[in-house]
């Protein structure tokens, strides 16, 4: 429960309160006592004792007409019968009010937050596995792939980083379930849309940066994308950063100026990988030793080193780190299947140019025969990826490419595929039925020298079409049908 008086006080302290509007009158303080038993931004979940948040560009006055709620919070006075708390920024208001309503669960958990263009989910699973070794399985996880609030039962995530109200409720639920640690991914959109406003993480990790999510509905420029991701830095008590990433200099400069304790990793840093072979690697630095992971690729080993440094800052021992990394399984990340003819099928969530480039390089290094790539791209977001995908394909002439449907949303998947193909000088194949495209690629393999890469969807069991998630068999189940 939270009182209206408390809500107003929170908003005033954050310089986010304008007035209360009711029946044509304005109030700086409400004359009566009001208690809210619930917070919601979903009208379907609102009751007479709910404080409702009217947010979003598409919110309409008629949504409030028959709404059952006590008050609503908004940046706009809709002049309806329901009294309104008018604010400057409704998303910031929701974040701070939710934190108070759920009694600041973020302060009772040890939190590790990861950002970066690629590798967040893999690193999140690495970190959870390590911390589970340390705390006996008491680590909650919020990732792009899955969420668990009790360390054991998983469900599909809706967003990389949940809305602030949902996030604080999840944190409270994790505490109720006996969790002591939380690992979560923090997207650039989370900072742009204030989903993590007011939160300070015990450890923040910045894995890498490359152009992605650039488009009219996400970030207008690379600068905006990078700036939003960089907000994790000043909202972390300890920070781990990749010294080899683009634009690292400003990260180092800001960390030093803000006097935030930190660790860097990379070839020219104190913490580095000095030997790498297959699934095995050796590190030097503050976490020095031999490690094994279940994923191929130097980039996965670098992510493992980043999470080793981050979890060490939370108290993990060398053995916790070694055992955790060795046991970590990441759904939809370099999942490996073997066809009857010996060909390998790699299923991976790689959904931007940098992650696809790294994936292709790893597979090329391990297969001398034919390489097949099944790939699509998202609709109505991340439009810059299409050029990036085209450039990866162009730079790897060994790839036999079948362009298909990803989450096309409200765009024509053939139009998306054509745009990818426009950046490639050689002929590509098209098959918009994703399952049939997978079947087609596998059928073309001949022996163990050959490989198929199925990129973009990972473990997703849906396809986004016309704004709705439609059931999809999943890349791995589809591939298994045709082995």
Swiss-Prot record:
Cell compartments where the protein resides: Cytoplasm
Alphabetical GO biological process terms: cell division; cell wall organization; peptidoglycan biosynthetic process; regulation of cell shape
Binding locations of UDP-N-acetyl-alpha-D-muramoyl-L-alanyl-D-glutamate: 43, 160-161, 187, 195
Post-translational modification: Carboxylation is probably crucial for Mg(2+) binding and, consequently, for the gamma-phosphate positioning of ATP.
EC number(s) from the headed UniProt entry: 6.3.2.-
Gene Ontology terms for molecular function: acid-amino acid ligase activity; ATP binding; magnesium ion binding
Modification sites for N6-carboxylysine: 229
Binding positions (ATP): 116-122
Pfam families, per database record: Mur_ligase_C, Mur_ligase_M
Keyword line: ATP-binding, Cell cycle, Cell division, Cell shape, Cell wall biogenesis/degradation, Cytoplasm, Ligase, Nucleotide-binding, Peptidoglycan synthesis
Disulfide-linked positions: none
Function: Catalyzes the addition of an amino acid to the nucleotide precursor UDP-N-acetylmuramoyl-L-alanyl-D-glutamate (UMAG) in the biosynthesis of bacterial cell-wall peptidoglycan.
HAMAP family, A to Z: MurE (MF_00208)
Family to which this protein belongs: Belongs to the MurCDEF family. MurE subfamily.
Name used for this protein in its record: UDP-N-acetylmuramyl-tripeptide synthetase
